[in-house]
C-alpha cells in the first residue's frame, strides 16, 4: 500500500525545489524571499534618481535620493504648500541654450519635484512646468496641485495630479501632463514686458494639497 502524502508535505517539497521560496497565506499576494533571507516587496523596489539634467544611475529609497539630489546635484528645497519661482531664459530664440530647473518641495509631510524646462514639440518651441510625487502612484493619486504663470494682465493656470517618480521625467514631459506654454505666448507673460526675444522672465507659482476622501 502506497504511503499517503498530505497537502502540507507537497507544499513543503515544492518550496524546497524553488530557488526563491514563496511565502503565501490566504489573504495576501505572494512575497518573494531572496537567498539572503531578505523579503522583496514589489512596491518597495528602489526609485531611480529623478534628476533629468544628465543620466544618473543612482537608485534608492526616498531619503537616500533626497540627500543625493541636494548634495550631488545641488537641488534646492522649498517648504510649504504654496511656492513661487522665477525662470529666466536669456536667449529664447534658441531653446538649445535653455536651462531646465528642478526644485524640491516639502509639503503635507511628503516630498515633490517641480520641473520647468524648454523643449521642442515637433518643431514648436515650448516651455513646460509639472510636478512629480516622490513615492508610489497609489499615494500620488491622493494629492492635487496647481501651477500658474502670469504677467502683463495675463494668467494661465493648470491643475492636475502629480505623477509618481516611478514614471521617468521624460515620460511625463512627452505625455504633456502639465502646464505648457508656447514660446510666443510665454513672451506675453514675461514680467519685464519683453517682446524683443532678448530675454524671457517667467514667474511660476502654485500650491499642493491633499484631497479629502469622499464619504459615501
Swiss-Prot record:
Induction behaviour: Induced by abscisic acid (ABA) and salt stress.
Keyword Protein transport attached: no
Recorded superkingdom: Eukaryota
Zinc finger motifs (SIAH-type), residue ranges: 5-74
Subcellular location: Cytoplasm; Nucleus
GO molecular function, one term: protein homodimerization activity
Keywords: Cytoplasm, Metal-binding, Nucleus, Zinc, Zinc-finger
Tissue-level expression: Expressed in roots, rosette leaves, cauline leaves, guard cells and flowers.
Phenotype when the gene is knocked out: No visible phenotype under normal growth conditions, but mutant plants are hypersensitive to drought stress.
GO biological process, one term: protein ubiquitination
Cellular component, GO, one term: nucleus
Chief place where the protein resides: cytoplasm
Function of the molecule: Probable inactive E3 ubiquitin-protein ligase that plays a role in regulation of autophagy. Upon starvation, involved in maintaining ATG6 homeostasis by competitively associating with ATG6, a component of the autophagosome complex. Acts as a positive regulator of drought stress response. Functions as a positive regulator of abscisic acid-mediated stomatal closure.
Annotated PANTHER family: E3 UBIQUITIN PROTEIN LIGASE SIAH, INACTIVE E3 UBIQUITIN-PROTEIN LIGASE SINAT6-RELATED
Annotated family: Belongs to the SINA (Seven in absentia) family.
Subunit structure: Homodimer. Interacts with SINAT1, SINAT2, SINAT3, SINAT4 and SINAT5. Interacts with ATG6 and TRAF1A.
UniProt-recorded name of the protein: Probable inactive E3 ubiquitin-protein ligase SINAT6
